From Swiss-Prot:
Any one annotated GO CC term: host cell cytoplasm
Protein name, UniProt field: Inhibitor of Apoptosis OPG037
One Pfam family this sequence matches: Ank
Gene: OPG037
Keywords of the record: ANK repeat, Early protein, Host cytoplasm, Host-virus interaction, Modulation of host cell apoptosis by virus, Repeat
Segments forming a coiled coil: none
Bilayer-spanning residue ranges: none
Ranges of the ANK repeats in the UniProt entry: 97-126, 130-161, 233-263, 267-297, 322-351, 353-377
Record's note on what induces expression: Expressed in the early phase of the viral replicative cycle.
Record note on quaternary structure: May interact with host caspase-9-Apaf-1 complex.
Superkingdom of the source species: Viruses
UniProt xrefs under PROSITE patterns: ANK_REP_REGION, ANK_REPEAT
One biological process term in Gene Ontology: symbiont-mediated perturbation of host apoptosis
C-alpha cells in the first residue's frame, strides 16, 4: 500500500514538473492530497518519504483537511506537522466538524504538536463549534495537562474569557480534575467560585461525572467551593448524590454536615425523599434521618407511596406518631406493607374499605376483607357498593356482597345510586339476591318502598309488579 501511495505521488510530482499549468487542474491537486491523507493512516511513517510526497502537494482547501488529519495522530513526530505548516497549510482553519488543528492536538495530549502549532501562529483563543477553546481539552496526565496549560497561556490564551454551550469556562468544564491540575488552573487566574448556566458549581458538576470521588470534593471544599449551594432548580450537591442509582456513602458522609436533609428543590424533593424514592437501603436513609430534628409529613407520605414500611418503622422509633390519615393514604396508594405495619401498630381508618374501593386495588380489598374490615363504610352518603356501581366494577362489588352488608347499607346504596343517576344494571342481580337471602329487609317499610321504587324504575313500563303487593 505504501509503495502504491509513493508511486502515485511521485507520478503526480513528475507531471507537475513537466506542466507549468499543472495546478490549474484541480483534479491533480485533489488527487495528491487524497494519497497524502491515506498516508496519514499508515502506521510506519518515514519523514524523508513524507517530504518527498509533499513535493507534489499544494494546499487546496478541499475536504481532506490534511493538517487536521496529521495533528490527530497520537505520538506523531511534530516535524511532520512542521513540514505541512512550511508547505502552507494554515493552523487557523476548521475541518467539517468545526475543529481547529490546535483543538485536535490538545484532545490527544500531543503537546509537541501543540507547541509547533502555536509557534506557527495558531490562535489559542479560537472556539470550536461547542464554543470551546483549546484550554477546555485538559485530558492526559497531570504533567501533560500542566505543560499544555503553560503553553497555551504563554501564547496568549485568555483566562475567564469564554463559556461553552453549558455556560462553563475551562475550569468548570473539567468535571473530574486532579487536585494538582485544579490548583494549577486556579493559580493562573481562573475563578473557582463560578457556576454554569444551570447554577451548578464544581461540586455539582463533579458529582455528575462518571466516577465522582469524595477525595476530590474534599479538596474542592477546602478551596472554598460551597458543598451546600443550590443550583437554579434548588438541587444541592447532596440532592444529586442522593438521586443517583448507586449511592456513594463516603460522599454522603462528606456533604451531610453542611446540608439540611429536608431542603426541598423546586420539584418538592429533598435529599431525604430522593433517597426513599430511589429505593435506597434503610440504613442509609437512617443516616440522613439522624441529622434531622424534624420529620415532615411529606417524608411519611413518600414512605407510604413507595411502600417503605421499613422506613416507617425507623421514623416511628424516632418519635413520629401515625394516625388514621396515614392508614387511609396507605390504602389509597395500595401500599400493602405499610397497611400491615400500621395495622400491627393498632393504627386504622374505619372507612378504609371505602377508599380501597375508590382506588380499585383488588389486592387491597382482599387484604382488608381478610382482616375483617367492614363493608358498611359510608362517606358523604356514598357506600362501598354505590362506588362500585359508579366505577362499573362488578368484580369488587361481588367480593363486597359476599361479606354481608347490612340492610341499612343496601338502603343507602340504592339512595346514592338513584341520587347520582348511576347505571343500575350491574347491581340489580346483587340486590335481588340480597333481598332473597334477607327476608326481613322487605318487612321494613322504608327499605321495601325504596327497593320497590329502585327496581320498578329500572324495569320497562307495562310489566306487572304485583309481586310487591303481598308485603303490605
Amino acid at each position: 500500500m505504501i509503495f502504491v501511495i509513493e508511486s502515485k505521488l511521485l507520478q503526480i510530482y513528475r507531471n507537475r514538473n513537466r506542466n507549468i499549468n499543472f495546478y490549474t487542474t484541480m483534479d491533480n491537486i485533489m488527487s495528491a492530497e487524497y494519497y497524502l491523507s491515506l498516508y496519514a493512516k499508515y502506521n510506519s511513517k518515514n519523514l524523508d518519504v513524507f517530504r518527498n510526497m509533499l513535493q507534489a502537494i499544494e494546499p487546496s482547501g478541499n475536504n481532506y483537511h490534511i493538517l487536521h488529519a496529521y495533528c490527530g495522530i497520537k505520538g506523531l513526530d511534530e516535524r511532520f506537522v512542521e513540514e505541512l505548516l512550511h508547505r502552507g497549510y494554515s493552523p487557523n482553519e476548521t475541518d467539517d466538524d468545526g475543529n481547529y488543528p490546535l483543538h485536535i492536538a490538545s484532545k490527544i495530549n500531543n503537546n509537541r504538536i501543540v507547541a509547533m502549532l502555536l509557534t506557527h501562529g495558531a490562535d489559542p483563543n479560537a472556539c470550536d463549534k461547542h464554543n470551546k477553546t483549546p484550554l477546555y481539552y485538559l485530558s492526559g496526565t497531570d504533567d501533560e495537562v500542566i505543560e499544555r496549560i503553560n503553553l497555551l497561556v504563554q501564547y496568549g490564551a485568555k483566562i475567564n474569557n469564554s463559556v461553552d454551550e453549558e455556560g462553563c469556562g475551562p475550569l468548570l468544564a473539567c468535571t473530574d480534575p486532579s487536585e494538582r491540575v485544579f490548583k494549577k488552573i486556579m493559580s493562573i487566574g481562573f475563578e473557582a467560585r463560578i457556576v454554569d448556566k444551570f447554577g451548578k458549581n464544581h461540586i455539582h458538576r463533579h458529582l455528575m461525572s462518571d466516577n465522582p470521588k469524595a477525595s476530590t470534593i474534599s479538596w474542592m471544599m477546602k478551596l472554598g467551593i460551597s458543598p451546600s449551594k443550590p443550583d437554579h432548580d434548588g438541587n444541592t450537591p447532596l440532592h444529586i448524590v442522593c438521586s443517583k442509582t448507586v449511592k456513594n456513602v463516603d460522599i454522603i458522609d462528606l456533604l451531610l454536615p453542611s446540608t439540611d436533609v429536608n431542603k426541598q428543590n423546586k420539584f418538592g424533593d429533598s435529599p431525604l425523599t430522593l433517597l426513599i424514592k430511589t429505593l435506597s437501603p434503610a440504613h442509609l436513609i437512617n443516616k440522613l434521618l439522624s441529622t434531622s430534628n424534624v420529620i415532615t409529613d411529606q417524608t411519611v407520605n413518600i414512605c407510604i407511596f413507595y411502600d417503605r414500611d421499613d422506613v416507617l418503622e425507623i421514623i416511628n422509633d424516632k418519635g413520629k406518631q401515625y394516625d388514621s390519615t396515614d392508614f387511609k393514604m396507605a390504602v389509597e396508594v395500595g401500599s400493602i406493607r405499610c397497611v400491615k405495619y400500621l395495622l400491627d401498630n393498632d393504627i386504622i381508618c374505619e372507612d378504609a374499605m371505602y377508599y380501597a374501593v375508590l382506588s380499585e386495588y383488588e389486592t387491597m380489598v382482599d387484604y382488608l376483607l381478610f382482616n375483617h374490615f367492614s363493608v358498611d363504610s359510608v362517606v358523604n352518603g356514598h357506600t362501598c357498593m354505590s362506588e362500585c356501581v359508579r366505577l362499573n366494577n362488578p368484580v369488587i362489588l361481588s367480593k363486597l356482597m359476599l361479606h354481608n352488608p347490612t340492610s341499612e347499607t343496601m338502603y343507602l346504596t340504592m339512595k346514592a345510586i338513584e341520587k347520582d343517576k348511576l347505571d343500575k344494571s350491574i347491581i340489580i342481580p346483587f340486590i335481588a339476591y340480597f333481598v332473597l337471602m334477607h327476608p326481613d329487609f322487605c318487612k321494613n317499610r322504608r327499605y321495601f318502598t325504596s327497593y320497590k321504587r329502585f327496581v320498578t324504575d329500572y324495569v320497562h313500563e307495562g310489566v306487572s309488579y304485583e309481586v310487591f303487593d303481598d308485603y303490605f
